[in-house]
Amino acid sequence: MGQNFSKKSSNDLVSRIIFTIFMLIICRIGSFIPIPGIDSIALNSVAEKNQFGILGMFNMLSGGSLGRMSIFALAIMPYITASIIIQLMSVAYKPLENLKKEGESGKRKINQLSRYLTVLLASFQAYGVALSLESMVTNTGPVVILAGFFFRVTTVITLVVGTMLLMWLGEQITQRGIGNGTSLIIFIGIISGVPSAIISMFELSRKGALSPLIAITVCIGVVLLIAIIIFFEKAQRKLLVQYPKRQVGNKIYGGEATHMPLKLNTSGVIPPIFASSILLFPTTLANFSNSNSETMSMLSYYLGHGKPVYILLYVVLIMFFSFFYTAIVFNSEETANNLRKYGAYIPGKRPGKNTSDYFDYILTRLTVIGGLYLSIICVIPELLMNKYVISLSLGGTSFLIVVNVVLDTMTQIQTYLFSSKYEGLMKKIKLKN
């Protein structure tokens, strides 16, 4: 009986992995279906010129869909942005904060609000893309075959539907597959661009544009970067939590101590992604006017990768969102109240406000280190790419996302296997009894 249960659990895990792979294949197929009314030759010419610009990272996150102007050109970024905005608003806006406390029903309502906001943001971005495409002209002719109202409407509908389809695929992976669907969609997009980035680097080395020593140094640097990211992502500060002793009859229960782990990088990869979104926003607004305007030229120059203004704003925004998102993920006051409710306490700290202040003190120190770690990981590759013209697929943000997704997915698989073995063990015990 135990063997049958173990076999059933193993088959369930395999089916979940197969389902996840199938959904990701659909995402990749969609990234090669172009939106209607585009001259592919002219578009390729434009994409080659802008592969190292500020739009390069978003092309990387979309798995090349933005460069090919496919139905998934906006990727799942509008949904991520909408979710983050709703989370930020839930801190400042009381009705949303109350919804979070309503449990499963409140969670469903918040998810629905995120979807509505996704449609709004995707529509805004899609219209900006349509206007940008209409303004693009190359030596072979305009990118848009027949510009006008019909093209704009078609583009907006196509891109919004593509984003909503990706959102749905991500939700299906989360519910019926393995790992976080949204993260895996971004992950597969980044991974798809790695082979071409490696080929491009070795091609530059072969032609003499990049010395073999630098190419080898980059490869060693990549391995070290991955090791550093794994170290910092796994780093924790463990706080001792003591539970009081309780006497029930002649027996004494409790009194044991446990540890509360606080991650060094509590905010995850959200700060660099959202910081990049903020830096892209002025450029998106400029596209509504004229792409050849002085404003657009200034924005393109000052917000170019590796430029001092871009680097400074990038670091400031990463630090800001590190603190802001950590405050959302970990509520010190709520955690302190929960500990007091169960009679637990931090040794040397009084329950309640004293404990809450202690959490804030620890988190502030951790977040400073975590924010600096994120800034260094994201900024150093930016400077190197600007100097040696290496593809954005090898950027710091992409490494952060890939390593985090792999670690999270592996943890979920291990948790699933452990819970399956635990359930099998419990069934065996019940059968013996």
From Swiss-Prot:
Q: Cellular component terms, GO, for this chain's entry?
A: plasma membrane
Question: For this chain's UniProt record, which GO biological process terms are given?
Answer: intracellular protein transmembrane transport; protein targeting; protein transport by the Sec complex
The answer to whether the entry has keyword Isomerase is no
Give the transmembrane ranges. 17-37, 71-91, 117-137, 141-161, 184-204, 212-232, 268-288, 310-330, 366-386, 388-408
Cell compartments where the protein resides:
Cell inner membrane
Membrane topology listed for this record: Multi-pass membrane protein
Write down the Pfam families for this protein, in alphabetical order. Answer: SecY (PF00344)
Q: What does this protein do?
A: The central subunit of the protein translocation channel SecYEG. Consists of two halves formed by TMs 1-5 and 6-10. These two domains form a lateral gate at the front which open onto the bilayer between TMs 2 and 7, and are clamped together by SecE at the back. The channel is closed by both a pore ring composed of hydrophobic SecY resides and a short helix (helix 2A) on the extracellular side of the membrane which forms a plug. The plug probably moves laterally to allow the channel to open. The ring and the pore may move independently.
According to the record's subunit comment, the protein's assembly and interactions are: Component of the Sec protein translocase complex. Heterotrimer consisting of SecY, SecE and SecG subunits. The heterotrimers can form oligomers, although 1 heterotrimer is thought to be able to translocate proteins. Interacts with the ribosome. Interacts with SecDF, and other proteins may be involved. Interacts with SecA.
The UniProt entry, under NCBIfam families, shows:
3a0501s007
Similarity remark:
Belongs to the SecY/SEC61-alpha family.
Query: In its UniProt entry, what is this protein called?
Result: Protein translocase subunit SecY
